[in-house]
C-alpha cells in the first residue's frame, strides 16, 4: 500500500457525537471532505441537521439523529439507525461533552452527576454500541475526545469534575483498547489543549491571556488543527496504534 493510500478513508462510514457545533462539527466535516459518509448525533436536532446538510452539500451521505447519549436505549437505537442508513460503521468519534466550572467545595451533586454522565458514561455507552456493530465486522476505529485536563490541572479555572471525567475517558480508552483488540477494533483518544471554540469565545475570552502565557507555543489552538489526527486515527496509517492518547496542546503538558 502506498503512503498516500495509508491515509485514505474514502468510502468509510463514520459517526460523530456532539457534532452540531464546535470541535465535533469540524471533525465531522473533515471526515466528509476525506470521503466518509457521516452520521451526526446531537442533543440538538436543529444543529445536527445543519451539519448534516453541509456534509450532503459536499456530496457525501449524512443523517442527523437527536439523541441523549446518557440514555442507553436512545444510544442503541441511534447506532442501529446509523448502521442501517450508512451500511455499517467504521469510525466512531465520541466528542460530546460539557464543562462546569465551580470550586470543588461548592459543587452541587447534581452538577457532578451531569458532567460524569455525559462525559464518561456517554462515551462508554456509545463505545459499547459501536463495538456491537464493529465486532462482527472484525474492524473499526473508536476515537474518544478526551482533554489535556485529564492529564494536568488547569488554571485559573476550577473544574475538578471536568478534569476527572476526562481522565476517566483516557483510562476507559486504554481498557477498551485491550479488551477489543482481538476483534480488530482500535480505540484511541485525542486530548486537545486550549482551543478557540464557540463556547470559549462566548464566555472565556478573559482567560485567553493566561492560557496563552502557559502554553509554550504562545497561542490557543483551533479545532481545525485536530482534523489531521482524526483522519490518521481513522485510517490504516494507524493500524498498529491502539490504547493511545494523542495530546495536541501546543506543548502545555510538556512544561
Q: Where do the protein language model's features map onto the residues?
A:
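Substrate-binding pocket helix/loop in short-chain dehydrogenase/reductase
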Residues: 75, 103-104, 108-116, 158, ...
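Short, small/polar-rich loop/turn modules that mediate ligand/substrate recognition or access, typified
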Residues: 88, 181, 186, 241-243
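Canonical Rossmann dinucleotide-binding motif of NAD(H)/NADP(H)-dependent dehydrogenases/reductases
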Residues: 9-38
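Alpha-helical segment proximal to the catalytic Tyr-Lys
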Residues: 132, 178-182, 239
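Active-site helix of classical SDR
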Residues: 127, 165, 173
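Short C-terminal tail/terminal secondary-structure segment
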Residues: 2-7, 231, 242-255
